[in-house]
Amino acid sequence: PMQHYENTASPRGSRVDGFNPEYGAPTLPTVEILREMMDEKDLWPINKEVWDYLDGNGFHLMSTMYTDLVNNYGKSSSIDEFAQKGQLLGAINSKSIWEVWNYNKLDYGDRFCSGLLFWYHNCSMPQVASRMWDWSLEPTASLYHTANSLEPLHAQFDYLKNTVSVVNDYYREFKNYKVIAQVYDINSKKVFEESAVVNLPSDGVVNDALTIRFPENI
């Protein structure tokens, strides 16, 4: 997902410049839906032949790149654990696409972006490469994080710059709005807080309103 921020997500070139007519990212279905698709013996350890067939028999990303990315959260010992981590990855996968577009909306960011079409929202057949909801109409974490990223007034975090930006999709301006960033450690102790007052232009963005400084020992 960090490749979306760097704009290196595709060897075909830029994916978040101008108007993008087709963009998408997979999300692993929930473990209950995976169990509807295949026998338990093919779920874990992952049977690559079966998973690749259920990946559209073309991209084969779920048994390769997606699995490698899920393992960044630590090696899994069961399909239940793997599927749960897969939801985390799917969430940030979709969130990063929308928030990068937010940041670069029109003339406000590092590069001009006038829009993108997300392909696709649902699955037309049982697939391990699900989207916002799957063949059984079961929503994934991608749906909720997409909805969050596209709320009309949205504060968002840039994972590469450690900055917070605020997006306004309303056709009216908002003045003297306060954005607050807080960081908590693993024990839910607040270790950082900073705020900034922003004037949001109509259908515009205030980028890098504040910078989060993460404590070294967090």
Where are the regions a protein language model picked out?
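Substrate-binding clefts and catalytic carboxylate motifs of secreted carbohydrate-active enzymes
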Residues: 3-175
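Intrinsically disordered, low-complexity Pro/Gly/Ser/Thr-rich segments with frequent PxxP/GP/PP motifs
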Residues: 177-218
